[in-house]
Amino acid sequence: DLHLLSRRQRQMCIRDSEVTKAGMTFVEGDFYGLKTVAVVSGIGKVNMAVCTQILCDDFHVTMVINTGVAGSLNNALDIGDIVLSSCAQEHDMDVSPLGDPVGIIPRMEQSIFTADETLVSLAKSACEKANPDIHCHIGKVVSGDQFIASAEKKNYLIETFHGDCAEMEGAAMAHTAYLNNVPFLIIRAVSDKADNSGHMDYPCLLYTSDA
């Protein structure tokens, strides 16, 4: 939503219209010369999937980009670093009693969704140009309806999914974008280490990453 944009970004945005659907406010406008729809999906995979489908159905978007924060699963990532999705997977999808590995979505050709290479490349260049001191990493995003804040769970996600960061929405957007044949990119600032200290680091970085 527009309140999450910096002052300079707001000055570069021309607001055309605003509509509320499924409890979410979709703002259409011109952002740096591009026709854009900005929206806050809410927390969790269902909210994100609903939001993405509305963007596809009602606004006919040609790409979707999700921004936010995530917990680090990669020891090379520090708080404040940026992760650009190479791919995304839902870590809480589990029908293993029926014979499929954890993370595999039954009756789907894909369970690991690949981000658009052009969007990844453009985002990496923009990130490095905006602040060369910030580490911008391309890696796997894993998502589930859980806030990861234990070393045990973190190690499980690393060993099982080889993820670089964990959050609660990105893979749902990727899943929905895949079903609609729409390119996607997830951009996440590392807010915490996804371990026993996660609940302390998250609120501070959430505020600064939105500023």
Predicted segments, located by residue:
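Single conserved hydrophobic/aromatic residue that forms the stacking wall/gate
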Residues: 1-10, 14, 207-211
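Metabolite-binding pocket within alpha/beta catalytic cores that recognizes anionic/polar moieties
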Residues: 7-11, 15-114
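Short, conserved catalytic/metal-binding motifs centered on acidic residues
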Residues: 68, 141, 169
